[in-house]
């Protein structure tokens, strides 16, 4: 495709290909002059909820099919599958030698990646960090697993209206694939090079419900705490917030707390 050489793409799971695509778009949009930057001070924090599940499926299938005749594994099996390989591939692409790792926290993965990037930059550990996440889990294991959890909508005849997280008739989500990426940069560093600045991160918060494997706390304790933590970190008051971007998976049990 337009972002990855076909030969190189064969060494990558689809989730990594998405990561490379969005990272290239973000770096280009940021205007970072990679050749004239201190590459030791540019990092990559890029997450995936599960990583190369398609690759795992393919290799497990090949093993089951050929095990009687002496199974053979693709030498790229592990490098394609692991969830931190996308961050590694992005750093290799640009020669970034700063902090490099993956986050993995289910649906909060990319948000955690951005939060970590913010914290490392304000600690002086990096001037800029390429941050985001990607996923490519539309595979038998991905679809079958979520279906077994009753997490997917059964409105197969009207997929365009099936995802309805704030409706009493919600019955699950629709799976998708793709990636998203931002370039976070220390403010003065960005100003000095005349960067196009979309927004400023004022603060971040993190928390846990400590309640259930998949269901959110019925009183929204984790959600309340994380917003309080973020406001405190940003030194802001609730009335200063104009917009709350809530996370709605459209499952029946998980999101009654969003209206509390």
Protein language model features and the residues they cover:
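Conserved active-site "lid/cap" helical segment
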Residues: 1-42, 226, 230-238
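Glycine/charged-rich beta-loop-alpha catalytic/anionic-binding loops adjacent to active sites
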Residues: 2-8, 64-76, 93-103, 160-168, ...
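Active-site nucleophile and cofactor-binding loops and adjacent substrate-binding regions
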Residues: 11-16, 39, 76-84, 101-109
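Active-site-proximal alpha-helical scaffold in enzymes
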Residues: 19-33, 86, 91-94, 99-135, ...
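Hydrophobic alpha-helical hairpins/lids featuring a short glycine-rich hinge
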Residues: 25, 30, 34-73
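Acyl-CoA/ACP chain-elongation machinery
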Residues: 125-171, 204-218, 248-253
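Condensing-enzyme catalytic core mediating Claisen C-C bond formation in acyl metabolism
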Residues: 157-236, 240-243
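Conserved small/polar residues in nucleotide/adenosyl-binding loops
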Residues: 256-260
């Amino acid at each position: 495709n337009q972002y990855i050489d076909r030969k190189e793409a064969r060494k990558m799971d689809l989730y990594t290909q998405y990561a490379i695509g969005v990272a290239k778009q973000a770096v280009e949009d940021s205007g970072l002059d990679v050749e004239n930057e201190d590459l030791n001070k540019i990092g990559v924090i890029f997450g995936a909820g599960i990583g190369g599940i398609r690759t795992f499926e393919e290799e497990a299938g090949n093993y089951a099919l050929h095990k009687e005749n002496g199974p053979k594994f693709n030498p790229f099996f592990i490098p394609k599958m692991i969830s931190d390989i996308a961050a590694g591939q992005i750093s290799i692409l640009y020669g970034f030698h700063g902090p490099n790792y993956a986050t993995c926290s289910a649906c909060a993965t990319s948000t955690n990646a951005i939060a970590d990037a913010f914290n490392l930059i304000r600690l002086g550990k990096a001037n800029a960090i390429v941050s985001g996440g990607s996923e490519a889990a539309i595979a038998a294991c991905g679809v079958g697993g979520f279906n077994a959890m009753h997490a997917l909508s059964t409105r197969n005849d009207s997929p365009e209206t099936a995802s309805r997280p704030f409706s009493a008739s919600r019955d699950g989500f629709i799976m998708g694939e793709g990636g998203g990426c931002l370039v976070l940069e220390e403010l003065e560093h960005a100003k000095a090079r005349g960067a196009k600045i979309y927004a400023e991160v004022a603060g971040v918060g993190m928390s846990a419900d400590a309640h259930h494997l998949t269901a959110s706390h019925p009183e929204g304790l984790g959600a309340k705490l994380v917003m309080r933590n973020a406001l405190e970190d940003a030194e802001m008051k609730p009335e200063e917030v104009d917009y709350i971007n809530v996370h709605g998976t459209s499952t029946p049990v998980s999101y009654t707390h969003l209206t509390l």
